[in-house]
């Protein structure tokens, strides 16, 4: 299978645009060389994805940090000339010869994660999430409307079968959602919107809102987003800083879903996701935290970066901090175990809280 001449021309146009954009510093621009374009512009995956599907978001959004997405699982292998160097640079030197370790969620280690902030002075809330792709389905740009609906039906059956009192709850499909339910989910910060301009340009919003929905338990501490950026985002959260409790609930919920729906895993890259930044463990362990003193210092970002922590505003990626509250998470997802990813966040935050106390 070969990409059409029109697609190949569009790929060359994206390359030319990126090279001429002095204000663009994405990993796509850096690693989409003339040689990579020449070698890969005619290739097509079995599901019909081309290099254009991989690069179009970064070509349209010159302020992207990374700029590439995988339209299907095969893309990670077929377009490895581009994915491998981007993955290596983003994921802390994870080379093309490296392999993601076997899964270790940390069942035996949960007890080591004592509450980071028992007095409740700093941490507003704690959240751990992971992404999963259902085996046998492509990612967003290659999904048909039928695919979306089939995946949603499968997940509804799983949700309806949950008997664990901590996890059982209700599934809310986005299709046909009434205003009252919508308002309630927005108030709880559970409702995800149509993808932003980065995802839109990557063709991740097709057939919206079909096949999309949200499941949450009665206590609103366990959530599953269906067909947002990834097929599944499995989330455990609660107020305060008890990371151990949050992780234990995530493990229980993830194991429950995994027993009934096999997930797509790559022998080298681990759990597969639409965006290469989430590969491997896919784990993002985060807190909303008040750090008014050290966040005012010039080297705050460097302190976090040195501890492999990522800072965002509390309204997610590409948002600013409000009232000195930051969303701080582990940056590394690949080349370490799931438990190590959580531990990276935990140990870094312990240190940040010590620094904040010392600055008082």
From Swiss-Prot:
GO molecular function: arginine kinase activity; ATP binding; creatine kinase activity; kinase activity
Keywords, sorted A to Z: ATP-binding, Kinase, Nucleotide-binding, Transferase
EC number(s) per entry: 2.7.3.3
Tagged with keyword Kinase: yes
Positions bound to substrate: 65-69, 229, 275, 317
Domain Phosphagen kinase N-terminal: 10-92
Top-level EC class: transferase
Listed InterPro entries: ATP-guanido_PTrfase, ATP-guanido_PTrfase_AS, ATP-guanido_PTrfase_cat, ATP-guanido_PTrfase_N, ATP-guanido_PTrfase_N_sf, Gln_synth/guanido_kin_cat_dom
Catalytic function, reaction form: L-arginine + ATP = N(omega)-phospho-L-arginine + ADP + H(+)
Domain of life assignment: Eukaryota
Positions that bind ATP: 125-129, 189, 233, 284-288, 312-317, 327
All copies of domain Phosphagen kinase C-terminal, residue ranges: 122-359
UniProt record, GO biological process: phosphocreatine biosynthetic process
Entry GO CC: extracellular space
Gene3D superfamilies: ATP:guanido phosphotransferase, N-terminal domain (1.10.135.10), Glutamine synthetase/guanido kinase, catalytic domain (3.30.590.10)
Family per similarity comment: Belongs to the ATP:guanido phosphotransferase family.
Name by which UniProt lists this protein: Probable arginine kinase ZC434.8
Lineage of producing organism: Eukaryota, Metazoa, Ecdysozoa, Nematoda, Chromadorea
């Amino acid at each position: 299978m070969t990409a059409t001449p029109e697609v190949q021309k569009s790929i060359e146009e994206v390359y030319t645009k990126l090279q001429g954009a002095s204000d663009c510093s994405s990993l796509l621009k850096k690693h989409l060389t003339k040689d990579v374009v020449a070698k890969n512009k005619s290739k097509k995956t079995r599901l019909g994805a081309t290099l254009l599907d991989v690069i179009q978001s970064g070509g349209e959004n010159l302020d992207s940090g990374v700029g590439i997405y995988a339209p299907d699982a095969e893309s990670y292998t077929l377009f490895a000339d581009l994915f491998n160097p981007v993955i290596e640079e983003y994921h802390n030197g994870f080379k093309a010869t490296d392999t993601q370790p076997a899964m270790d969620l940390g069942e035996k280690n949960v007890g080591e994660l004592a509450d980071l902030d028992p007095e409740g002075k700093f941490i507003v809330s704690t959240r751990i999430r992971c992404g999963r792709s259902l085996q046998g389905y492509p990612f967003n740009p290659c999904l048909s409307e039928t695919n979306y609906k089939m995946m949603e039906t499968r997940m509804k059956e799983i949700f309806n079968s949950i008997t664990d009192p901590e996890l059982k709850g209700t599934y809310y499909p986005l299709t046909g959602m009434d205003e009252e339910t919508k308002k309630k989910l927005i108030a709880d910060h559970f409702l995800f919107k149509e993808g932003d301009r980065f995802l839109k340009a990557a063709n991740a919003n097709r057939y919206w809102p079909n096949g999309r929905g949200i499941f949450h338990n009665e206590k609103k501490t366990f959530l599953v987003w269906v067909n947002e950026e990834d097929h599944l985002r499995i989330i455990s959260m609660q107020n305060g800083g008890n990371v151990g409790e949050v992780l234990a609930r995530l493990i229980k919920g993830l194991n429950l879903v995994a027993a009934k729906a096999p997930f797509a895993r790559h022998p080298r890259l681990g759990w597969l996701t639409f965006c290469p930044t989430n590969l491997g463990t896919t784990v993002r362990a985060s807190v909303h935290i008040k750090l008014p003193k050290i966040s005012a210092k010039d080297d705050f970002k460097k302190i976090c970066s040195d501890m492999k922590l990522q800072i965002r505003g509390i309204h997610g990626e590409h948002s600013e901090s409000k009232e000195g509250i930051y969303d701080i998470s582990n940056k590394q997802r690949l080349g370490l175990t799931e438990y190590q990813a959580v531990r990276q966040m935990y140990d870094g935050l312990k240190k940040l809280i010590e620094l904040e106390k010392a600055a008082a």
